[in-house]
């Protein structure tokens, strides 16, 4: 068996006038994440972890932020396409563990929905998908509420 571990990271700036979408869940908040697509920081980190584990590059290689085709793209669609490409390369996704770092809003009420979306998009049982939420203890740009960051790890097997 060939086991592969991938690590993913993403960060986006919080700005007025955009919806806040994390893990495919629209979260009520006065600001949203700035980006070419829907800027779903969590799904972007997971997508990078999956592509990385399969040695298929990163999200930008597959879904460029300079390509008009991905303007406003739903990151759940991108995650499903990523999973299809990883599977086409001969891998099976085993699990995903992730962390979202945001000073605000509180994400705990939305974690179950995020996990359900990710599990559905990757074709995994819910118990193989984890999402954690942390603050940055008011330190740095995250602590000031200027942005939201996500980190993810994924295990693949061939």
From Swiss-Prot:
GO terms for biological process: isopentenyl diphosphate biosynthetic process, methylerythritol 4-phosphate pathway; terpenoid biosynthetic process. Signal peptide: none annotated. Pathway: Isoprenoid biosynthesis; isopentenyl diphosphate biosynthesis via DXP pathway; isopentenyl diphosphate from 1-deoxy-D-xylulose 5-phosphate: step 4/6. The record marks 36, 135 as: Transition state stabilizer. Pfam families: YgbB. Its cofactor is a divalent metal cation. Its EC number is 4.6.1.12. Homotrimer. Belongs to the IspF family. This is 2-C-methyl-D-erythritol 2,4-cyclodiphosphate synthase. The gene is ispF.
């Amino acid at each position: 068996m060939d086991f592969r571990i991938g690590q993913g990271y993403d960060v986006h700036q919080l700005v007025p006038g955009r919806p806040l979408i994390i893990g495919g869940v629209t979260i009520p908040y006065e600001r949203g994440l700035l980006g070419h697509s829907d800027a779903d920081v969590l799904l972007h980190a997971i997508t990078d972890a999956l592509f990385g584990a399969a040695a298929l590059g990163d999200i930008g290689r597959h879904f460029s932020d300079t390509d008009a085709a991905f303007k406003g793209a739903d990151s759940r669609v991108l995650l499903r396409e990523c999973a299809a490409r990883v599977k086409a390369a001969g891998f099976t996704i085993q699990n995903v563990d992730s962390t979202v770092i945001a000073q605000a809003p509180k994400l705990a009420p939305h974690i179950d929905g995020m996990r359900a979306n990710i599990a559905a998009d990757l074709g995994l049982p819910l118990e193989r998908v984890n999402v954690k939420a942390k603050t940055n203890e008011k330190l740095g740009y995250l602590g000031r509420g200027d942005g939201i960051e996500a980190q993810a790890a994924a295990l693949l097997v061939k």
